[in-house]
Amino acid sequence: MEIQILPLIIVVAYLVGMLVVGAVVSKVQIKNAKDYMVAGRRMGLFMVAFSLSANNIGGGCTTGLAQKAFGDWGVSAVWYVLAASIAMIPLSYFAPKIRKTMAVTIPEVVGRRFGKFSSNFTAILSVLSLFCLTSSQIAASGGVINALIPSIPLNVCLIFAGVVIILYTTMGGMIADQISDLLQFGIILVGLAIATPIVLNHAGGWNAISAALPGEKLNLTQIGWASIIGYIFNYFCTFLAGPEMVSRFETAKDERTARNASFLSAILMAAMSIFPTLLGLAAFALRDQLPGLAVGGSNAMMIVTGHYAPGVVTGLISAAIICATMSSADSNLLCMSTMIINDLYTGLGGKKKLTDKQTIFCTRACNVLSAVVAILISLANVSIVAMNTFAFGIRCAGPFAAYGLGLAVPKATKNSGVVSIICGTVAFVVWQIVGGGGTWMFLMPVVAGCLVSTVSFYVVNWIEWARGVEPAPSAYLSDDEVTKKIAEESAGR
């Protein structure tokens, strides 16, 4: 009973601590709208790197990774997170460019280069996807809480998770989000680093575990090179055009910090890929000694750590995983509300220029309203996998080239951005329908959409360069505009 009660106490204390952090940050650190939306653009290397990592590490990359290792993937499950680590390396090329824009959102940059239609279309796609992602993360958070406390109905757990997310995000904004990311990722990584050797030792060491495993479970490329490469491209595409990742680079104190944070995040995620994989394999080897272990190993990581590791370690890991899942939800929620106010309000006809106080108030109001809708969607029992697959694809397949290549190709024309957004989005939808959400013609839907977006971007540019069409305006501000923007963002501090 101790193993069940102690984690519960730690989880409750942890959630209360999150709310306290949000309240303190709201009172002490939030002085203007940029503090709330992009943490005042003053975050250091570790804050940015840990926040980038935490946004990709929740239940799916911890308990889900252990489940894959327990199942058919075996040791090759490590690629599920290691692929994300590898994808962060080319992202380091774009990171300083993202920070250099001095923007708040992706639609803002797309609009600077390719006009209002491109900005509005990108914002609508992003907001639609972020609604789905917020709903799925609330559902996942409620599911983790329900797994820890089965006596509480799932719907109650969903509502509880949603309320905590609303309060925390609404109070603390991006600063509180990054503080929690640092703590949560650190606790998960350290907790698993402590628990894994303990579990392996109880199992008789790695030699004993490997001897108890079928040969295919020890094949590092069991899932196949096509899947491994596909995952790397999939992560890169969703990271480069992902609002929650881009917003982290925008919070960096300078361009060098943004680039180095990408490299450090790659190292952190690579380390994180190892421990859940080993725990999943250990659970499979010890499955006859683990009462309560699900047939498919969905609870493999928590069961094996709960059985062998100290209760304090299990409790901290449980709390951090729940809160990391919630952190993904509040990141999506904050990005969504920021786009509604920063991009759609002005882009769709908002006449009144909002003051800093009005911007913060309206963004917080959007947080509450959007989260309530997301909670209702999560209560409808829509498939989390289906929501995530649709959301990740629809938000980045179209804008991928317009945003990413818009930063890197100075001579890009306006039409190249517009056409690439439309073509990439249509290609994703077609691939999603024809392939049934899976791989078709060796390509995942999101990768296919990004590929079509990129090809159409360059084809239009080559045609218009030959015709002498003028380049679109720059994605970057002039020196005078940068000076003015810094002054505006410093006002009120």
Predicted regions and their residues:
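Membrane-embedded helix-loop-helix hairpins and adjacent transmembrane boundary segments
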Residues: 1-493
